[in-house]
Each structure stands twice: as C-alpha cells, then as structure tokens.
Amino acid sequence: MDRLSGIASDQDVRRVASGPSVHTQARRTRVAKLYFRYGAMNSGKSTGLLQTAYNYEERSQRVLLIKAVVDTKGEDSVVSRLGVSRRVDLLVDADDDLRALVRRRALAGAQPVCEAGGAQREAVSLREVLDCVLIDEAQFLTALQVDQLMEIALIDDVPVLAYGIRTDFRTVSFPGSRRLLEIAHSLEELKTICRCGRKAIFNARKVGESFVFDGDQVAIDSGEVTYESLCGKCYLAAGGRLSGQ
C-alpha cells in the first residue's frame, strides 16, 4: 500500500501531515479545515482513516480517533476489511458535546509546551497538543455534533477528517452525512465498484441471501445482516426504490 494514500488527495492536508512538529512555531500558520471523505461500503474508508493516522504519527504528530457508540462493529476499535484495527480514543453518544470531549481528552495530562529559550508552560489550547481529529462512520453523528467538529477546525485550528457513507440502504441520507455535505470545506468521494463493474453508489442491505428495503435505518453488518455496494441500475434491479420519488 502507498504509505501516503491516506492523505495524498488533499494537498493542504498533506502539508499538515508532513509538516513541522506540534511544538514548532511554523505549525501556527496552518489553516485547519473540516474534510468529509465518503463512499459506498467497501470503498476503503476505515482503511484510509487508519493509514492517515499512521502517516501523522510517523511524523511525531498527535491524532485523536473517534467513533459513535451505535457503531458496534469492532466494539471500541476501528476495523478495516483488510483486517487492520486500532482502538479509538473516544466513543461518543448522540448527546455528547464533541468539542468539549476532544478538548478534555487531549488537554488532560498533556506534556508541557516548550517555549523559545527552553522555558516550559502548561498547554492551554487544543492546537498545542493535537494535530488531527479522525472520525470513523461519521454518518452516525448528529447534525449538532458535525457543527462541533467544524468548531474544532475553525476555533481550535485543528484539522478534522470525517469518513462515512452518504445514504442508508433506502437511499435516505444520514443526519451526520447530510450536515457534513452541507458545511465541510472539502468533499472527497472514495470509489468502489458494483458487481457489474460500474461505480457503486448505493448500500443495499441483505438478510441472509435476500435483499431487504424496509426496516430501521441503522443495522450494523454482523451475522445475518450484511451489505452490498451496488450501482443505481443494479440497486433498482434488486428491488430497491428511490425514496425521493
């Protein structure tokens, strides 16, 4: 795997990931943004997130990994379909204030900040102790929590990279994805292919070997419930309906 594949698509993110340490003055010139990297299931979102975390940490920069409690796959870990996994730093509920949680976690027990001349002081701002926030399955966040991620980027000056899918198995958008599409500075589609070879854009739910198009919006793939990424043509052929009609 290309060691830069997790961040190569956005030049400004690449500059952050390859730039100076959190303790250097040059870091303060960075302009932080909220990024949304989305795609159908099996498009490599979790793999990309884990690669991005590795790229930052290889440069001695600090990251914070987040996922929603409702995502029970892997329990407290981000798990890619390649078998790579990593424990997250924060599991969040729908009523959690993400900015407050991130600040509390990152600043708690942070190492003293080195000033010019060798003097040390206690860290008081998030950007002094954190280089990037990474969110897996960001579609499970609330719209308010996405706004809080934007505040981390704009107010705390820390880049936020959110990975997730746009729509559920009925082609209805998730609240978190909808808000990310509305306000994120940068949108990047991660592509995968349908069984027919076309680009997959929908996530079809299966129970056993049969496609289903009714049920709760959230059903984590495990046991009998699985998902298949389909193009629009194959989605309709399988019995799917375009819910906007």
Can you describe what each PLM-predicted range is?
Residues 26-113, 117, 168-179, 189-192, ...:
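Conserved P-loop
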Residues 153-176:
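Sensor-1/coupling segment of RecA-like P-loop NTPase cores
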Residues 140-141:
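Residues immediately C-terminal
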Residues 133-134:
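Walker B beta-strand of ABC/ABC-like P-loop ATPase nucleotide-binding domains
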Residues 137:
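Walker B catalytic acidic pair
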Residues 193-220:
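Short recognition patches in nucleic-acid-associated and regulatory proteins
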Residues 52, 144-152, 176:
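A short acidic, amphipathic alpha-helical/loop segment
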Residues 184:
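Short basic (Lys/Arg) and small-residue
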